[in-house]
Amino acid sequence: MATSKEMTAGPALPLIFNFTLPLLFGNLLQQTYSLVDAAIVGKFLGINALASVGASTSVVFLILGFCNGCCGGFGIPVAQKFGARDYSTMRSYVSVSLQLAVVMSVVIAIFTSIYCADILKMMRTPENIFEGAYAYLLVTFIGIPCTFFYNLLSSIIRALGDSKTPFYFLVLATVLNIILDLFCILVLGWGEMGAAIATVFSQGVSAFLRYVYMYRKFDILRGTPKERKYQSKLAKTLLSIGVRMGLQFSITAIGSIMLQSANNALGTACVAAFTSAMRIKMFFLCPLESLGMAMATFSGQNYGAGKPERIWSGIKASTLMMVIYTAVTFLILMLGAKSFALIFVDPSEIEVLEKTELFLHISVSFFPMLGLLCILRYTIQGVGYTNLAMFSGVSEMIARILVSIYAVPAFGFIAVCYGDPMAWIAADLFLIPAFIYVYRRLKRQVLTSAVA
């Protein structure tokens, strides 16, 4: 039997650290097969193919970010009911979230597949990479149900305090993805489409195995027929939280789309540099994202248990870990950015290497801003204030749009490099007072309940 874990008692730092580690390893593995995708495509198919895969990165983030946000949102009521030990309602939430996932993922897959070509044209994708970008993006969209369930099941399991089980299945998915990448690209010669097929298929296999394992091993999830029925009241709660979290990712991605569209207009070398730099950056951001995800579960459970003071302890502990990590990462990327870029492109591609290095040097200088963003945003989401988290995404969107419209045409690629850091700062300026407001309100709620 798999075990769940309560985070409502004990020192915050070791609890969060130990919960973060499996999430971190999982996110690193996820980024590893993203790196492998790009490395195999770049090394064996050339920089045009690498640019094809990267030309739609922000669009993929827009669509899949919405799906992943919904999945994370669906896990919040589960974590809250688990923290409150209301296991019957918790099981009902799990059942309804799975039912909603079926409908939502199929509808999104159909809609995005139909408009795939139009999306790439809107992105000003260069003609010489359009065909490869279309093949890659279409397969990714068709595979959205696999991605949706892949993330939803992880969110549910994490809500129960178990961050290890999703990691084990992610190991399987990563190994399978790498093998299929090599087979589809080198043996079958399917090019960019083969890279997408490998990713979607490996996620589908992992999602299926997670589902089987979850219901066989977690006794706490085995519900009665009544608990497994669709309940509109619970569905409204899930959609209210999930859609708002999904929109937060999508709103953020709109700014990213504008930024990438502006970058696409700068030519293939800039697209290839942006692609390789983003893959490297996302790899090094995994600990910050994992720390934020841990805080969502930590804050959700302690909110459900009526212990807001532990949420503040969690903020302090996670911020300390974030500062240490970002300092180390700054040294690594300032010294080794070009070496990491060589994973994707040949040494002869001097322009691409230099632009990749420039992007990484600027980004890593602002990692503490992103670290604070992750901690505060996920904490606010964990206690159910998803509207505020969504508004922070609006701040990011506005910053990226302003950079795209005014700075990139005037200053070129270096302005693209500053797009994300400006967005992180804008979000922090909103999130810091937002968290103070939420925390004070939670404390008042506890005091009111105690008096009553």
Feature map (PLM): residue ranges:
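Helix-terminus/linker motif at the lipid-water interface of multi-pass membrane proteins
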Residues: 32-51, 120-127, 183-190, 250-279, ...
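Short alpha-helical transmembrane segments in multi-pass integral membrane proteins
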Residues: 1-20, 78-143, 187-242, 299-366, ...
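Short runs within selected transmembrane alpha-helices of multi-pass transporters and secretion channels
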Residues: 71, 139-158, 166-174, 195-208, ...
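Transmembrane helical elements of multi-pass membrane transporters/channels
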Residues: 18-34, 139, 150, 173, ...
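Small-residue-rich hydrophobic transmembrane alpha-helices
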Residues: 50-110, 147-166, 273-337, 370-392
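Interfacial/gating helices of multi-pass transporter permease domains
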Residues: 41-61, 127-132, 192-195, 234-241, ...
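Signature of the first transmembrane helix
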Residues: 14-75, 79, 243-263
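Hydrophobic transmembrane alpha-helices of multi-pass small-molecule transporters
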Residues: 62-65, 109, 177-182, 207-211, ...
